[in-house]
């Protein structure tokens, strides 16, 4: 049975996390040549490449499995050592989350764990359609995703759904939709997307107004909170979670442009199996808060 040296695995992990050999060497306080040698030792042990040497480097499928193993072992080891010695060593938990969850329900959900447990969070923000890939690559130990199916050796639970409304300010609606939201009016109304892979706005318009992708002027802004600000100041129409703008809707600062029409995103919590005690606390906190604030039907 091939048993990797965890020191060499940490070199592979550092190259992925630091996005290159030079920064990985600095992180590990060794030479760049030593990093390369450790990874070569791993590749010789398993008889195949573990790293695709692109910019930035990325792990192969076997490399992903080894990184996932490393993170599981590190989490269990740190937790066990802390509990056994009485030293509250903060556990590093790397989680992949979508920006809208981070801006709405996720941090309140984690408050009990952050208050009562010695952990350090590394929250990696990614679109909910792609967070599971970070778990697959071994970059994180848990992920909030829209994918219902678990990866091999992983667990999954349904969290609940975010409902996205098509909203804008009253002034924006009067300017761009004086006769209501029509197909022709939408072609001139500026919108916003999180990045070039964010297709929620386009999917909503295609489904309800038969508008093809790319037909609507669209800003790219990598901030969930900025969506709200852009809508409030009357410069764009946006797809925003109802949970994020309850006050603005109640006050009339923002209006629902298409009452009865919305996009629903069901969210799922993925993590490696078996769960450590600390990850079980995180899971329980997310599921409990999700049942309270996310749509369950």
Curated annotation (Swiss-Prot):
Signal peptide: none annotated. The keyword DNA-binding applies. Gene3D superfamilies: 3.40.190.290, Winged helix-like DNA-binding domain superfamily/Winged helix DNA-binding domain (1.10.10.10). Residues 4-60 form the HTH lysR-type domain. InterPro entries: ArgP, ArgP_gammaproteobact, LTTR, LysR_subst-bd, Tscrpt_reg_HTH_LysR, WH-like_DNA-bd_sf, WH_DNA-bd_sf. Coiled coil: none annotated. Residues 21-40 bind DNA. It comes from the Bacteria. PROSITE patterns: HTH_LYSR. The keyword DNA-binding applies. Keywords: DNA-binding, Transcription, Transcription regulation. GO terms for molecular function: DNA binding; DNA-binding transcription factor activity. Pfam families: HTH_1 (PF00126), LysR_substrate (PF03466). Homodimer. Belongs to the LysR transcriptional regulatory family. PANTHER family: HTH-TYPE TRANSCRIPTIONAL REGULATOR ARGP, TRANSCRIPTIONAL REGULATOR. Controls the transcription of genes involved in arginine and lysine metabolism. HAMAP family: HTH_type_ArgP. This is HTH-type transcriptional regulator ArgP. It comes from Serratia proteamaculans (strain 568).
């Amino acid at each position: 049975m091939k048993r990797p040296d965890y020191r060499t695995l940490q070199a592979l992990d550092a190259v992925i996390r630091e996005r290159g050999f030079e920064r990985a060497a600095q992180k590990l306080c060794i030479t760049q040549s030593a990093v390369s040698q450790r990874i070569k030792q791993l590749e010789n042990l398993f008889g195949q490449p573990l790293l695709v040497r692109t910019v930035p480097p990325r792990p192969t499928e076997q490399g992903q499995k080894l990184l996932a193993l490393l993170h599981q072992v590190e989490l269990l080891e740190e937790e066990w050592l802390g509990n056994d010695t009485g030293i509250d060593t903060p556990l590093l938990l790397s989680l992949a989350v979508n920006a809208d969850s981070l801006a709405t329900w996720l941090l309140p959900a984690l408050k009990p764990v952050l208050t009562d447990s010695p952990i350090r969070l590394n929250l990696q923000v990614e679109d909910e359609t792609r967070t599971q890939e970070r778990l697959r690559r071994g970059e994180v130990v848990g992920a909030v995703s829209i994918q219902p199916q678990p990866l091999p050796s992983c667990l999954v639970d349904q969290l609940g759904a975010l409902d996205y409304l098509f909203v804008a300010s009253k002034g924006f609606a009067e300017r761009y939709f004086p006769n209501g939201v029509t197909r022709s009016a939408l072609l001139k109304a500026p919108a916003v997307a999180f990045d070039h892979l964010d297709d929620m706005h386009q999917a909503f318009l295609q489904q309800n107004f038969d508008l093809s992708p790319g037909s609507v002027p669209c800003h790219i802004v990598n901030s969930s909170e900025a969506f709200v600000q852009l809508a409030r100041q009357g410069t764009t129409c946006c797809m925003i979670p109802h949970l994020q703008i309850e006050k603005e809707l109640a006050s009339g600062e923002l209006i629902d442009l298409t009452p009865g029409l919305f996009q629903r995103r069901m969210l799922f919590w993925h993590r490696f199996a078996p769960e450590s005690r600390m990850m079980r606390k995180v899971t329980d906190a997310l599921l409990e808060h999700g049942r309270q604030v996310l749509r369950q039907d």
